[in-house]
């Protein structure tokens, strides 16, 4: 790997900034000042320091976000803020992208990474990765709806795989229900459309889990953090 590419990947600065830092003698390779941006290094063997601090190269990064409403799950958009706008410069420099998508008015768990292989595995229909949602519903969900979900709902453009519907609470006076839904797919507006098929309406939707990942209750909407070592190991094992 070229030295300048390594330094950019470690978020030392932009390609132009890195070249200036090299000229200023602020970077050392194996204890010697290095000014050539084109120098080929082995990131697994060579010791690279910036202002005396050892730099560690990470090929892949993994972030958990509590996506807020009003933000879209994309890397760029001409009209709306994206989830990348919620990250800091260092995180954005890793060129991460959202794994799957949550609707603009849906909030909750979202994984961002630059690991394309992991993203492909999590989104592959063959793997049937479960995703769990908490929904506030206008209308009273009943046992017959549980059975309809379990059979697989035939929507206009596709038939849903059997899904698990749990009725957490109902309020007849307010004509509302709280439910938990687990699906193995992730089609456009799927949970909302499944509930609508039963004659009710989702008024708030939050994703709680994706595979082995569980939304951190300490993350406020719009906040994010790196996956813990344990979370990452369990996730990688689950798709191996």
Where are the regions a protein language model picked out?
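Basic, flexible Lys/Arg- and Gly-enriched helix-loop patches that mediate nucleic-acid binding at interfaces
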Residues: 1-240
């Amino acid at each position: 790997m070229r030295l300048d590419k390594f330094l950019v990947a470690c978020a030392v600065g932009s390609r132009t900034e890195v070249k200036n830092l090299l000229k200023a003698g602020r970077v050392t390779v194996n204890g010697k000042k290095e000014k050539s941006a084109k120098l080929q290094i082995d990131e697994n063997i060579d010791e690279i320091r910036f202002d005396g601090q050892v730099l560690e190269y990470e090929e892949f990064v993994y972030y958990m976000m509590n996506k807020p409403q009003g933000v879209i799950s994309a890397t760029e958009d001409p009209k709306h803020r994206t989830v990348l706008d919620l990250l800091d410069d260092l995180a954005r420099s890793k060129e991460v992208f959202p794994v799957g998508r949550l609707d603009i008015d849906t909030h909750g768990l979202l994984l961002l990474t630059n690991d394309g292989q992991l993203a492909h595995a999590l989104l592959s229909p063959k793997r049937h990765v479960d995703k769990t949602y908490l929904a506030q519903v206008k209308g009273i969900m009943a046992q017959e709806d549980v059975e309809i979900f379990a059979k697989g709902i035939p929507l206009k453009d596709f038939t849903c795989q059997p899904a698990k519907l749990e009725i957490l609470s109902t309020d007849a006076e307010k004509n509302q229900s709280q439910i938990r839904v687990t699906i193995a797919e992730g089609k456009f507006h799927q949970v909302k459309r499944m509930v609508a098929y039963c004659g009710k309406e989702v008024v708030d939707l939050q994703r709680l889990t994706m595979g082995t990942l569980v939304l951190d209750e300490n993350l406020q909407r719009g906040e994010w953090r790196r996956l813990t070592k344990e979370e990452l190991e369990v996730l990688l094992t689950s798709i191996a």
